[in-house]
Amino acid sequence: MLISKHEERVKSILSARMENGNLRSRENTQVEFKQSFNKGNIAIYAKTMAAFSNNSGGYIIFGIKDSPRSIIGLQNSNFENIQQEDLTDSINNLFSPSINWELGSFILKEKEINSNGDVIIVQKIIGWIYTEESNIKPVIAQKNNSSEKIVNGDIFYRYRARTEKIKYAEMEQIINCRMKQERDSLFKVFEFIRNNGATNLGIVDYNNGKLSTPYGVDVVLEKNLIAKLLKKAKFIKEGSFSENEGIPVIKVTGNINLAEEVPVPLENLDETYPYIQKQLAEKLNITPQKLYALIWYFKMKESKKYHLEITTSKTNKTHKFSKFALLFLKEKIIELDENKNELNNIISKFNNRKK
């Protein structure tokens, strides 16, 4: 069975032992130990992941007891039953831009001495979440969470074995690094234009998913599709236009599920975006006020998959919503019906957003 590089790294961290079997490894800028995984502690994990993301990435390793640091393994199936989409939604509701992460688990075989003095082999389940270093720093809290003392606008950073609010020196470093990245990106664009000519170029705007071409045909792609493409596709260097000069010829391969990530055609707007807000509320059998709150909370107007603003005159605009928007809201309403307090909180935040 193929072992991922992250599993290998976690096993390496856990391999350093003292004579009594306790872990020699300590928590540091890239490692956090947790005894168990609890769905009610998502904010705790998200805060640590945001801190890792703002530094150089890192691992949360589950199944490790503190004081003394020893491997006990996970005692229930909470970690194995994680719904990754739900966890992603919970994390990205708290922090922005999106945090990229992976998780996994494995069985660690440990030698132990039982009550009879016999050496036995015990299987212990270890879980891990790896957080990538963010390409777009800083990752910022966009929502309050009183239990973890998270306030909208907070920036967390990983310092040695602690997650803390970022200090001046590290914030200055992030700002300088981002400015350098933008300068380097501009230089690359200018160099590419100089070598290839502006008339041959197309531009992808990752913020709105718009692909502009030199042929007068623009295509809008859902941002999640672009993210999945960049994450899942494998870029394989297979030669170049010239053996001695020129840019490499890249073949793009990958197995990407496009079931719900189909680019939205703009030719027939009434068919693609059939609902105004009043019609959408009627379809969902909810009040317009509740609909406005849900649209605001889930930021649906920011995605062309769900929403399109149409100018009808010099002073008037209308908001149209897609069939994807109807399906998305139906699912969310079913979820919120099971948690009335959450729905009331959404409506309350919407009503107080400008106060």
From Swiss-Prot:
Protein keywords: ATP-binding, Nucleotide-binding
Organism whose genome encodes this protein: Ureaplasma parvum serovar 3 (strain ATCC 700970)
Keyword match Nucleotide-binding: yes
Protein's name according to its UniProt entry: Uncharacterized ATP-binding protein UU034
UniProt GO molecular function: ATP binding
Superkingdom of this protein's organism: Bacteria
Binding site for ATP: 58-65
